[in-house]
From Swiss-Prot:
<feature type="compositionally biased region" description="Basic and acidic residues">
    <location>
        <begin position="290"/>
        <end position="304"/>
    </location>
</feature>
<keyword id="KW-0175">Coiled coil</keyword>
<protein>
    <recommendedName>
        <fullName>Uncharacterized protein ORF95</fullName>
    </recommendedName>
</protein>
<dbReference type="Pfam" id="PF09810">
    <property type="entry name" value="Exo5"/>
</dbReference>
<dbReference type="InterPro" id="IPR019190">
    <property type="entry name" value="EXOV"/>
</dbReference>
<dbReference type="GO" id="GO:0036297">
    <property type="term" value="P:interstrand cross-link repair"/>
</dbReference>
<dbReference type="GO" id="GO:0045145">
    <property type="term" value="F:single-stranded DNA 5'-3' DNA exonuclease activity"/>
</dbReference>
<feature type="coiled-coil region">
    <location>
        <begin position="269"/>
        <end position="307"/>
    </location>
</feature>
<feature type="region of interest" description="Disordered">
    <location>
        <begin position="290"/>
        <end position="310"/>
    </location>
</feature>
Length: 310
């Protein structure tokens, strides 16, 4: 890979402790060069956190804007997006910002997983959540002993819920998964909206069931996987200064596989489907011909038997 230091490696260097339970403050120099203490509003903290998340989400994707009219259209778009992201995880070994909606222990859950790393040799998935704080870190506390117990438990719970959600996506029965992704679409065997087909550059005959079959094929890679979890604790001040001064690169090489891969996969699956249908027809005709031949032989034997009795 062409990057100087991966996001995971970079943020592992910053793992530390959330130690301040009071008002978040930031030190900055005023116009005269004097250091002053400023209180940050919740909006400022959130805006900077969003910026850091966007920096960490540096895998380039070819996003396609698609207008939709109905809930069924939205379900199709989400299904197509999930297929593309799972393929990127499979091929590139990592994916960012995976939207996920699953059923865990009878409860419907939604979330966006910040980063997932796939090690195909070990069949291991690392689920990562980015936590950005505007507070200096103590870098010699890898076990996070200084973090309040409630924070540690909350973060741990969140990550383990993400693991449960991801595992459900990979292991749920096809019927349960179908119900989650396209259950409310009235006719799953009718072609999807032509505008969606045009945007994705796929045949206008593609159906919701065709897309769902591709999802099943793509998720079949992730069977019997082991899970690990990681929280990326990022000090906002330190991260921004490192990023802006170029001390550490956090930019991955480009990955633009979504639309091109999706188009090829759909065409391949349709061709495979047609081939299987053709083979099924051939086998069906052969079986019918065999039955006709057997019936003909039985009739001939019955005639011979009747003549012998006379």
């Amino acid at each position: 890979m062409s990057h100087e230091k991966s996001v995971t490696e970079f943020t592992r260097d910053l793992v530390g402790v959330y130690i301040n339970a009071g008002v978040v403050k930031s030190y900055a120099k005023d116009t005269k060069g004097n250091t002053r203490l400023y209180e940050l509003s919740n909006k400022e903290i959130m805006d900077i956190g969003i910026e850091i998340h966007s920096i960490c989400e540096t895998d380039e994707k070819e996003y396609i804007d698609i207008d939709y009219c109905t809930e069924a259209d939205l379900k199709i778009i989400r299904l197509a997006n999930t297929i593309s992201l799972l393929n990127q995880l499979h091929v590139a070994g990592r994916v960012c910002e995976l939207p996920i909606k699953t059923l865990v222990h009878g409860t419907s859950l939604r979330g966006i997983i910040d980063r997932i790393i796939w090690n195909k040799d070990k069949k291991e998935i690392e689920v990562i959540d980015i936590k950005s704080h505007y507070i200096p870190f103590i870098l010699d506390d890898p076990e996070l002993k200084g973090m309040p117990q409630s924070k540690r438990l909350g973060y741990s719970f969140q990550l383990h819920v993400y693991v449960e959600m991801l595992d459900w996506l990979f292991t749920a029965s096809p019927d349960a998964l179908r119900d989650s992704f396209i259950g409310s679409i009235y006719n799953k065997d009718e072609p999807i909206h032509p505008i969606i087909c045009s945007k994705l550059e796929i045949p206008k005959t593609i159906t919701a069931n065709n897309l769902f079959d591709i999802l099943l094929k793509e998720r079949s890679v992730f069977t019997d996987v082991k899970y690990t979890v990681l929280i990326m604790h990022i000090d906002q001040n330190y991260f921004k200064s490192e990023y802006k001064t170029g001390k550490a690169s956090v930019v991955y090489e480009s990955i633009k596989c979504n639309r091109e891969w999706f188009k090829k996969m759909v065409f391949f699956d349709l061709a495979e489907l047609e081939r299987k249908k053709s083979l099924a027809e051939i086998h069906k005709k052969a079986a019918m011909a065999k039955k006709r031949e057997e019936k003909k032989k039985i009739k001939q034997e019955l005639k011979k038997s009747a003549k012998g009795k006379k």
